[in-house]
């Protein structure tokens, strides 16, 4: 990114790579994750203040192990090698790396030797997080051994004159007691960064960039009302105003009042050009009689493409398509070390013959940064902090066929759940919460009469990133209020159940 201090992280396949980048940005210093294949010349052109070599799953002795351009070490730019990165640095400078009989994984206690630069003002003994197979058994000549541990005699090294540093542990992981302090020392004391990166100056720079790219031409954006597409629309509108047109497809599978809310915020408050497509009947017709969850997803995804294509083809002189691709999407799909390759299409995978130039202004930001950006742009909290919501909408929160009656039950019950969770002050504490209709009826008694009505399920989970989750311990009195309201205020419900399954073995969504 232009006009900002950059700390470059080279990716060698560690599961913690994104954490390194995140930690640096938390200091107010811009950081990017790039392939380990970058050449020294390419890095020189990027002009970073510092370079971090990440950890990785390989042994340096594996035939296909990842290596970097060794010219990096001669650029005069400070380098911090983490785990595998320290081993590469050691090999380059004639140190010795050996395979360990047993992989070291977990917490370890290190002891400092003297007062190393990166460990300034931290205790002599401290807990760190190890995750390695190989280890450095002889430090390179002219390098100091800064820390040791019982199982890793060389846990940290440095050559202060050359601004080269290495740690065998992972400072980016919270389990490392003084990891943030170590990274902070590297970024500010060694690299000389000032910490001038913020969402505010991101807005200024990105607005200027969009204006230069678009000129007097027009941009199309698929607006769902979700966090990413909403923030993209707000940012681009700030840059080019009426040159932006948004298409909002209401497929009838949204949450209560969601469609109206999107139109109020963006058409009325932001004064954007929005084309709202009421496609409810079209989608429900296609879903009639369909119970298989994967088939439901496929039908909805394909139909969205057709609807969007129909509307886009009516517009004249559109040159650009805006998408809410995030930095996590770029990392997952674009690095050489990615274990799982994903294709990210925020509008569901548009036809290949739609000849637009993509604009992805959020593709250097993480989710929490996007939320902060949205707040800075004036997007209301109720949208910025929206619950994660699947593309197929309420259709996959209904087990079995999607009907008007089933949608109404899920829509009303979900609204009550969200209202009560917010009243209890739990809406920022719980990662995701929603109701699901399992399509099960049971016998009950209401008003002295027998009933035979639907069961509604509540799903609420806590999580850091959605990859794993645990069921949320909602207080009993809150659950009682929710249950009472669901049974009394939603037609055709006489029983409420709470899902107490973690992920794994279950997924967060039921379908």
Curated annotation (Swiss-Prot):
InterPro entries: Class_I_gatase-like (IPR029062), GATASE (IPR017926), GMP_synth_C (IPR001674), GMP_synth_GATase (IPR004739), GMP_synthase (IPR022955), GMPS_ATP_PPase_dom (IPR025777), NAD/GMP_synthase (IPR022310), Rossmann-like_a/b/a_fold (IPR014729). It catalyses: XMP + L-glutamine + ATP + H2O = GMP + L-glutamate + AMP + diphosphate + 2 H(+). Its EC number is 6.3.5.2. Keywords: ATP-binding, Glutamine amidotransferase, GMP biosynthesis, Ligase, Nucleotide-binding, Purine biosynthesis. Pathway: Purine metabolism; GMP biosynthesis; GMP from XMP (L-Gln route): step 1/1. ATP binds at residues 224-230. Gene3D superfamilies: 3.30.300.10, 3.40.50.880, HUPs. The active site is at 83 (nucleophile), 170, 172. Residues 6-196 form the Glutamine amidotransferase type-1 domain. The keyword Chloroplast does not apply. It is an enzyme of class 6 (ligase). Pfam families: GATase, GMP_synt_C, NAD_synthase. Homodimer. PANTHER family: GMP SYNTHASE [GLUTAMINE-HYDROLYZING] (PTHR11922:SF2), GMP SYNTHASE-RELATED (PTHR11922). This is GMP synthase [glutamine-hydrolyzing]. It comes from Oceanobacillus iheyensis (strain DSM 14371 / CIP 107618 / JCM 11309 / KCTC 3954 / HTE831). The gene is guaA.
